[in-house]
A protein has these predicted regions:
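Active-site acidic Asp-centered loop
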Residues: 100-102
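N-terminal glycine-rich phosphate-binding loop and ensuing alpha1 helix
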Residues: 2-49
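Conserved core of the sugar-phosphate nucleotidyltransferase
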Residues: 82-83, 105-196
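Hydrophobic helical membrane-anchoring modules
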Residues: 178, 191-215
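Short phosphate-binding loop-to-helix
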Residues: 53-98, 107-114
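Short, high-confidence coil segments that cap the C-terminus of an alpha-helix
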Residues: 43, 93-94, 124-125
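Short beta-strand scaffold positions
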Residues: 49-50, 170, 201
Length: 215
């Protein structure tokens, strides 16, 4: 079975200017996920979808393939599914596609490898994503989500909510073509027990949190 990684990294960012180029642990943010995917040693090919010449040059130096990002995918209106659609159109000959993000620099190579192994060896699931379990009393749109206020469970019995970390997604080619989405109908959520691995760097506050972990 052929497995590839696709890493979307655009040059421009809105909330944190040049976010993907900010330095973290002595190197630009975008380099961490590329290097971690290489270290995982579980992909037939690693692709970086980018519009940045600097990132393209780094990919060449690491023998990583480049997908030239089309301009509309660099707009704030584009999302991860849009990028995955475009990438699969350009590289259609894989059995499994994994999408990883530069904003998850602490995702360990062994975790990446474990996610790939899980999806490839378990037919029960058609997709996978990294996640955390969130415990507490949650509400949405004035309604309780995971408990009934008039029947209070013990805190240790409360059902957790599953939160995507948005660091890694994987899906079979068959499921992708059926659902046109990076998550299929039978996903496995891979729980990250190390809080550091679940960090998603999207705001200046996130970077401050990351610095706390690395100081």
């Amino acid at each position: 079975m052929k497995v590839c990684a696709t890493i979307p990294i655009k040059e421009r960012s809105t909330r944190v200017p040049r976010k993907n180029f900010k330095e973290l642990l002595g190197k630009s943010l975008y380099k961490h996920i590329i290097d971690n995917c290489l270290a995982a040693d579980c992909f037939n090919t690693i692709y970086v979808d980018t519009d940045s010449e600097e990132i393209k040059n780094y990919c060449v130096s690491k023998d990583v393939e480049v997908i030239d990002r089309k301009p509309e995918l660099s707009l704030d209106t584009a999302n991860g599914n849009d990028v995955l659609h475009y990438d699969i159109e350009n590289i259609p000959n894989y059995d499994f596609y994994f999408q990883l993000y530069a904003t998850a620099p602490f995702l360990k190579p062994k975790t990446i490898r474990a996610c790939v192994d899980k999806l490839l060896t378990t037919s029960k699931y058609d997709s996978i994503f990294t996640a955390t379990e969130e415990y507490g009393w949650y509400w949405y749109s004035s309604q309780p989500i995971n408990y009934q206020p008039n029947i209070l469970p013990r805190s240790q019995d409360v059902a957790p909510l599953i939160k995507e970390t948005t660091g890694l997604y994987g899906i079979s080619k068959q499921a992708y073509h059926r659902y046109r989405c990076r998550i299929g109908a039978r996903p496995y959520y891979f729980i990250l027990n190390d809080p550091k691995e679940s960090i998603d760097l999207d705001t200046l506050r996130d970077f401050s949190r990351a610095n706390e972990y690395t100081s």
